[in-house]
Amino acid sequence: MNSRERVLAHLAGRPVDCLPLMPITMQFACDLIGAKYRDYETDHRVLVEGQLRVAEQFGFDYVNTMSDPAREASDCGAVVEHFENSPAAMVETEALLGDKTALTHLKLPDPLGGGRMHNSLRAIAL
């Protein structure tokens, strides 16, 4: 079974030769290619290079476009702090939903609008 067959069979509940190996490798992939994490999470080409390299080198069954836990929140208007060599993080003292009623006023972000989610879609396209 190749990786694609393994993952699709597993998702469909069919037997597989072994469980798909699908670890979350964001920081590891970035370190493997010697990139700065800020570049990994903001430049889709760096993310793709890291994901392809780590999957090929270690025999993982997939690649992903995850970069940090703040990508979508950022596009919704959350205040996010970026770091040179670790994942971005939301600034908790300025939490977008510190007041839960703010949820009713949030606008849906446009994933193609040039924000951080757009970077993820560019990675998928590569």
How should each PLM-predicted stretch be described?
Residues 1-126:
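Catalytic cores of TIM-barrel enzymes
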